[in-house]
């Protein structure tokens, strides 16, 4: 919220509380390092809040990078972590280039398909700068954040035809199609799909965690 990204702030608090009550999130779990070397680590979040595990992972990556010049930490068994850019900026504040990403549940279609095929997996980077806080980018691989579609539905407003498709894969301006039967449109068509797949490989496969295809 402080960064102006209201779709990823306190607006999600009720959802986090419900998920905790339903057993999908542990409010007492602590991230555990399963395996590590001087410049890498594999972390199990044990279903803790994504903010807890992701902050732990980025701080650990920065600690290792201070010694080795570069480091990678991957996380499995985590939950929604909010805005990806927050964690990238943790590295920038320590004088480093930070990259953060996460795969999410399927909510986006891909060219030539119908329905939700893959997540709109967010990716962010931040680099320290002299005249500004950081050189910074935080984007999902859909044309717009899914929460903006949901907000438009609550407000009864139409949306641009580039945001979602209906159950037949046809672009629509009616937000009521999502998420019950429609899907998000990928940013720049196959390009957004390709980048979402990269995040899937690095976040889900590399960590040994869940992927969009885990339930198939």
Specify the residue positions occupied by each region the protein language model found.
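Phosphate/diphosphate-binding glycine-rich loops and adjacent basic-rich segments that engage nucleotide
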Residues: 108-177
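Oxyanion-binding "anion nests"
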Residues: 171-211
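Catalytic-core signal marking the mid-to-C-terminal active-site face
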Residues: 213-216
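Generic secondary-structure signature for well-ordered alpha-helical cores
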Residues: 1-5, 18-25, 63-67, 93-97, ...
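Conserved active-site and cofactor/substrate-binding residues in soluble primary-metabolism enzymes
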Residues: 8-15, 52-56, 60, 82, ...
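Active-site cofactor/substrate anionic-group-binding motifs, chiefly glycine-
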Residues: 8-62
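A generic, well-ordered mixed alpha/beta core segment in the N-terminal half of proteins
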Residues: 38-130
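Predominant activation on well-ordered alpha-helical scaffold segments within soluble catalytic domains
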Residues: 14-18, 59-62, 89-92, 126, ...
């Amino acid at each position: 919220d402080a960064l102006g990204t209201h779709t990823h702030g306190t607006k999600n608090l009720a959802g986090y509380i419900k998920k905790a009550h339903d057993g999908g999130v542990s409010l007492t779990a602590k991230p555990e390092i399963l395996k590590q070397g001087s410049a890498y680590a594999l972390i199990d979040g044990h279903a803790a809040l994504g903010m807890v595990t992701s902050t732990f992972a980025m701080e650990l990556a920065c600690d290792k990078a201070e010694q080795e010049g570069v480091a990678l930490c991957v996380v499995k068994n985590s939950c929604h972590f909010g805005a990806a850019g927050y964690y990238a900026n943790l590295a920038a504040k320590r004088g480093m280039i930070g990259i953060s990403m996460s795969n999410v549940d399927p909510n986006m279609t891909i060219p030539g398909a119908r329905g939700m095929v893959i997540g709109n997996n967010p990716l962010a980077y931040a680099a320290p700068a002299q005249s500004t806080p950081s050189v910074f980018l935080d984007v999902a691989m859909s044309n717009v954040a899914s929460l903006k579609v949901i907000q438009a539905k609550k407000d009864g407003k139409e949306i641009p035809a580039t945001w979602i498709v209906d159950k037949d894969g046809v672009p629509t301006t009616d937000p009521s199609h999502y998420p019950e039967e429609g899907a998000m449109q990928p940013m720049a068509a196959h390009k957004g799909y390709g980048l979402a797949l990269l995040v899937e490989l690095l976040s889900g496969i590399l960590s040994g965690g869940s992927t969009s295809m885990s339930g198939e």
